[in-house]
Amino acid sequence: MTTTLVSATIFDLSEVLCKGNKMLNYSAPSAGGCLLDRKAVGTPAGGGFPRRHSVTLPSSKFHQNQLLSSLKGEPAPALSSRDSRFRDRSFSEGGERLLPTQKQPGGGQVNSSRYKTELCRPFEENGACKYGDKCQFAHGIHELRSLTRHPKYKTELCRTFHTIGFCPYGPRCHFIHNAEERRALAGARDLSADRPRLQHSFSFAGFPSAAATAAATGLLDSPTSITPPPILSADDLLGSPTLPDGTNNPFAFSSQELASLFAPSMGLPGGGSPTTFLFRPMSESPHMFDSPPSPQDSLSDQEGYLSSSSSSHSGSDSPTLDNSRRLPIFSRLSISDD
């Protein structure tokens, strides 16, 4: 058994070392011959070169260890990560190593403060640009963007231009070269100043609608919102076309009926018109609109006020205050004390 293992190892080593040369004639025992025949599967019948892709090409040391372990019945040593990578034919170390370092081509636009702030000269002259959508200049007025300038941009004269008559910055200079630039800058400032400001009449629910904004503007522009409306009489209101017709409305009253209804309570003569009382200023109204009494004279004033109110409702006398009369409850208390 030992002789068989040693002979198999020797023949395997000689096969690895003599690979690429012509087939050699080995004098070996039957077991070695069987191993050689099993290894040379696919080799031509006559003596010739063996097929190069029929045998793997590992290192000789690893192949010896694997062969000895397989003959002794031991498990084969595990392949390291490096050996497994190189044994894999589909692995490309250079490509895999360079793959993470490659940058993906960015499809976004270049972030520049002057992007699309000037018109593309070839596009304006020829109607076409070789850069297409990737061009950094504006292809038309609709793509032109406004450039954010410094507050002092074009506010002072360019010393270089007005000294030697030439400026290396040209139209991109931040100072004024001629009167046209000054006028253009002034026009741009006027446009920004004339921009309408936001209204401050925003509700909590959000921005007002167009109809509400138009109504508010109409109210502000109308002169009736500044001056009070004129005082109308009852006759004007009754004769207004906006009121319903008296013949069809059962709750409509004529001026004479209104006078007869309100005359007893208002102290008006029976034949008078209620328009003189309903639509006259408050300064000429009865004392029912007087200020409340002071705390010192509250009892007497309350008594007089109540008495005047009762008398006005009864229609017996005019609505005047009577300080001599008291409430019935206070009269009873004074009698019981006596």
From Swiss-Prot:
Effect listed in the UniProt record for changing residue 334 to A: Inhibits p38 MAPK-mediated LDLR mRNA stabilization, but does not inhibit interaction with CNOT1 and CNOT7
Positions of region (Necessary and sufficient for the association with mRNA decay enzymes and mRNA decay activation): 1-111
GO cellular component, as recorded: cytoplasm; cytosol; nucleus; P-body; ribonucleoprotein complex
Cellular location(s): Nucleus; Cytoplasm; Cytoplasmic granule; Cytoplasm, P-body
GO molecular function, one term: mRNA 3'-UTR AU-rich region binding
Predominant location category: nucleus
Induction comment from the UniProt entry of this chain: Down-regulated under hypoxic conditions in endothelial cells (at protein level). Up-regulated by growth factor (TGF-beta), cytokines, tumor necrosis factor (TNF-alpha) and epidermal growth factor (EGF) in keratinocytes. Up-regulated also by glucocorticoid dexamethasone in keratinocytes. Up-regulated in keratinocytes in response to wounding in a p38 MAPK-dependent manner. Up-regulated by the parathyroid hormone (PTH) in osteoblast-like cells in a cAMP/PKA-dependent manner. Up-regulated in response to adrenocorticotropic hormone (ACTH).
Keywords attached to this entry: Cytoplasm, Developmental protein, DNA-binding, Metal-binding, mRNA processing, mRNA transport, Nucleus, Phosphoprotein, Repeat, Ribonucleoprotein, RNA-binding, Transport, Ubl conjugation, Zinc, Zinc-finger
Keyword Metal-binding among record annotations: yes
Residue intervals of every C3H1-type zinc finger in the record: 114-142, 152-180
Residue stretches in coiled coil: none
One GO term (biological process): cellular response to glucocorticoid stimulus
Effect of residue 336 to A: Inhibits p38 MAPK-mediated LDLR mRNA stabilization, but does not inhibit interaction with CNOT1 and CNOT7
Record keyword DNA-binding present: yes
Spans annotated as Disordered: 93-113, 273-338
UniProt note on tissues of expression: Expressed mainly in the basal epidermal layer, weakly in the suprabasal epidermal layers. Expressed in epidermal keratinocytes (at protein level). Expressed in osteoblasts.
InterPro entries membership: Tis11B_N, ZFP36-like, Znf_CCCH, Znf_CCCH_sf
Spans annotated as Necessary for mRNA decay activation: 185-338
Function: Zinc-finger RNA-binding protein that destabilizes several cytoplasmic AU-rich element (ARE)-containing mRNA transcripts by promoting their poly(A) tail removal or deadenylation, and hence provide a mechanism for attenuating protein synthesis. Acts as a 3'-untranslated region (UTR) ARE mRNA-binding adapter protein to communicate signaling events to the mRNA decay machinery. Functions by recruiting the CCR4-NOT deadenylase complex and components of the cytoplasmic RNA decay machinery to the bound ARE-containing mRNAs, and hence promotes ARE-mediated mRNA deadenylation and decay processes.
Subunit structure: Associates with the cytoplasmic CCR4-NOT deadenylase and RNA exosome complexes to trigger ARE-containing mRNA deadenylation and decay processes. Interacts with CNOT1. Interacts (via N-terminus) with CNOT6. Interacts with CNOT7; this interaction is inhibited in response to phorbol 12-myristate 13-acetate (PMA) treatment in a p38 MAPK-dependent manner. Interacts with DCP1A. Interacts (via N-terminus) with DCP2. Interacts (via N-terminus) with EXOSC2. Interacts with XRN1. Interacts (via phosphorylated form) with YWHAB; this interaction occurs in a protein kinase AKT1-dependent manner.
Protein name, UniProt field: mRNA decay activator protein ZFP36L1
Organism per entry: Homo sapiens
